[in-house]
Structure formats: structure tokens, C-alpha cells
Amino acid sequence: MAYTNNLQIIYGDATLGITGKNFHYLFSYERGGLESLNINNKEWLYRVPTPTFWRATTDNDRGNGFNLKASQWLGADMFTKCTKIELKVDDRQFDELPIAPINNQFSNHEYADHVQIAFWYQTLTNPATDVKIIYNIDNTGCINIVMHYFGKKGLPPLPVIGMRFIMPTAATGFDYEGLSGETYPDRMAGAKEGKFHVDGLPVTKYLVPQENGMHMQTKALKITRSSTLNNADQESEFSLKLKQDKQPFNFSCLPYTAEELENATHLEELPLARRTVLVIAGAVRGVGGIDSWGADVEKQYHINPEKDYEFSFNLN
């Protein structure tokens, strides 16, 4: 029997490996997520992707005290607690993870048509709530990612709900299909739909570094890098593509995490750009701007922490 268009499954002691033509994915049970995303021998992950809830506070946020009201989400953004992992290979639902010694029953010639692995996380907030991230991998290597945030009464207001991907090196640029320029829920009126290219990873030069670079209602995104952490690799461009699933997604692509921006009080305090920080967001709080000394963001641009949110996208 030929397995030319199937996934090879490697049941490791603490990981699940999925291999196909020109790709290899590694899911870590210990770290609670996708540990390696290797396509055409190029690694795309520097850290395990995690739920993200924080954006660097803006002048408006500080003026109306939103940073203090939402501060629990900063800790939840920095520290992730994975509570449960669910695995389904083709039609087989595993009652327990196939780690040692259970994985001894499998050979090194295990194949499947599709795999679903779900990671459950508990937020380090009071009260705590749950987030579920599902990875659906088909036999072409395409990964459909679904994130579900479970709302709970009593939680503080949210800055953002999304996933954060940190890549090993800085991107040379990105192309996207969506709205022109930097957009937010309350900053979309002047944007035009189209296809756009951005050189490098630009950061808006505010006097005090803060949230910037969001792109709303995006249909497709291509991130291009030319370097890796392997000194033996010659520089040449390679790309990762993301596409909308059921609905357009929102994204930012910067050289810094929200925490790095938050910690800097002047631009020169930011570190040298070494990584690519991609945030795919299902919900984004508006930035406001009625004034900078007390006016809140208009209510329709808030994220309700008591409401469920779900978004999805495709990656290949």
C-alpha cells in the first residue's frame, strides 16, 4: 500500500510528530502546544504558540486607567497553564495520551489521513476561565487552527483575544489582502480593501512605545524571511502563508512582543529587532481617542469578557 499522500505519525514519549512531503510538525505535551513548524526545511517557530490577551497600553489606555483595570490579563498573557490535551487520529479518539509506555504499541510506520489535537488552557485570572486551541491537520499538511475563548462572569475587560506566534528571525516583509494601513475596530473608516506589501517589520514611532500595527478584516497573509538560526543556511527568501477560514482574521506583525513594548518608555529602550512576533486576533479592543485624559473607548469597541469568542484560520 502506498502512503504518498498520507501523514506519517510518530508517537514520541512526550511529543507527537507529524511528517509529510516537505513538512514536519512537532506537538509537545510538556510545553502544551505546537513546538516545531518545519516547512521545506525551514523552521517557523521560536516559541510554542500561546493564547494572547494583552496589547501594549496606549496613551488613551493610560489616561482612562484601562491598563489598571485589565492588568490581570498581562499575567495571563505572559504565563500559560495547559490543563488538558485531546488527540484524535483519523477516527480514533485517544482516551489517554499515547506517551510511554503506551506508545510502545506503535511502530515507526504509522500513517493517517488527518489528525486533530486540542490544547486546553486555564487563564491565570480571578476568576479563571478556559481557552481551547484546536489544530486540524489534513493529508496535504494544511493546518486549520481554531481558538475558542470561554467567557465568564466577573472577569476584567480584555485588550485582545488571539494567538501569538514568535518566529526565529525577523521577517523581511509581509504581504496581505485586506484593509489598507493600520486599522482597529474604531479606526477603519478610511481604509480601502486591496492587496498590500509592507517592507520589514515597521513600528509606529510614538514618543512612548505602545500598541501599533494591527490590520483588521484580513483574508490572506504571507510572511517572508530570508535568514534562519542555522549558520549553515544561505540567505534566500522563504514564506509562510495564512488564509481566512470562515471569516477574515485580524493580525499584527512586529519585531516585539506586547511586553517588550510595554516595558519601554522611549523608542531607544527597545531591543534590537531579532524575531518576528505574529498575533492573529479574533477580537480587538478599540484604541479610542476622544481625549487622552479620561475618556473610555466607545462601548461597541470593547471586548466583553463574559461572552464566548471563536475564530479560525488556515496555515500552510
UniProtKB/Swiss-Prot annotation:
Transport as UniProt keyword: no
Listed EC numbers: 3.2.1.23
Coiled-coil regions listed: none
GO biological process: lactose catabolic process
Catalytic reactions on record: Hydrolysis of terminal non-reducing beta-D-galactose residues in beta-D-galactosides
Matches recorded under InterPro entries: B-gal_small/dom_5, Bact_Beta-galactosidase, Gal_mutarotase_sf_dom, GH-type_carb-bd
Gene Ontology terms: cellular component: beta-galactosidase complex
GO MF assignments: beta-galactosidase activity; carbohydrate binding
Cysteines joined through disulfide linkages: none
Keywords, comma-separated and alphabetical: Glycosidase, Hydrolase
Domain of life according to the entry: Bacteria
Pfam families: Bgal_small_N
Described purpose of this protein according to its UniProt entry: Component of a beta-galactosidase.
Subunit details: Heterodimer of a large (LacL) and a small subunit (LacM).
Entry protein name: Beta-galactosidase small subunit
